[in-house]
Amino acid sequence: MLRPATPADHVHYARLFPDLATGDPVLPPDRWLDTIAPGTLIAEDGHGSVIGYAYLQILQGNCYVRHVAIEPDRRGQGRGRMLMDAIAARLRAVDCTRWCLNVKPENEAAVRLYRAIGMTTRHTMTAFRLDWDLAARLPRGDRSVIASLVAPADDAAIEAAFAMPAGQIAEARKRPDLVLLRLVDPARPDDAGLGFAVYDPLFPGAFPFRVAAATLAPPLLAAIRAHERPDTPYIQLVSEDADLTAALLAIGGTVRLSALHMAGDVPGPAPSRHPPSAPDRC
């Protein structure tokens, strides 16, 4: 069975999250309660013992499955499939028809599971750690752009331009600790697809980090740096674009994680309503 997480479940998150090997730190209880716990479901067996957890972000017909973790002694017993089936049932109940997640390509068992439930690989994403002095070496383009904070009126255009699920930006805006930035060409202010990032100064990192061209990364990074904490000599970001990944590798960016982004329809009976088709990217 699945149940919503409670403050007491931080111990399960803290025990299981490192097994995902993302390289990210375990959040302390207060930050976990503010950021991850609201979307976390705890999986229990028939005796009330915790066997794993899932962290979900549900957005207007789309679900981003952020974490899936199973207790080590319960792996290889079909528990992962049971957890995903239970998640799918919950999503169907709220008319959520699409889901996506990230998985390491070397985790062959997980990749097989996700393919078995209808997901396919859409692209590869690479998480980087980049010292700010290295970021200054990224090649710049000739296009004149400025950075600005994202206004709610800009959300739909940015989401459409970067094939993001509707509501993702509004969901990020609910967290006052996040900084939402976009790039604007003064000569073409209606062009919403130049650059967009959500920056977490406490992490510190940017995800999503989207640019129309790798040469637009420098001005977006410069805007992010204006919001960094004084004790932060580096930035972490996720590239979902081959040209940007190549540019970051060329200047010596450190790869922290490479993953497949997989997505598909939530399996099971058709929902009572039929939301519009969702973009491939979450």
Residue ranges and their predicted role:
Residues 10-11, 15-55, 159-182, 186:
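Active-site rim helix/loop that mediates acceptor-substrate recognition in acyltransferases
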Residues 13, 117-202:
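Amide-forming acyltransferase catalytic core, primarily the GNAT-like/NAT-type
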Residues 42, 48-57, 64-69, 190-201, ...:
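Conserved beta-strand in the GNAT
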Residues 44, 68-75, 203-217, 238:
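A short, internal acetyl-CoA/4′-phosphopantetheine-binding micro-motif in the GNAT/acyltransferase core
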Residues 71, 101-110, 129-133, 235-245:
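Conserved beta-strand-loop-alpha-helix junction that forms the acyl-donor binding cleft
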Residues 74, 78-86, 215-223:
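Conserved acetyl-CoA pyrophosphate-binding loop and the N-cap/start of the following alpha-helix
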Residues 91-102, 125, 229-239:
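Conserved GNAT acetyl-CoA-binding A-motif
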Residues 100-104, 115, 120-133, 254-265:
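Conserved catalytic-core motifs of GNAT/GCN5-like acyltransferases
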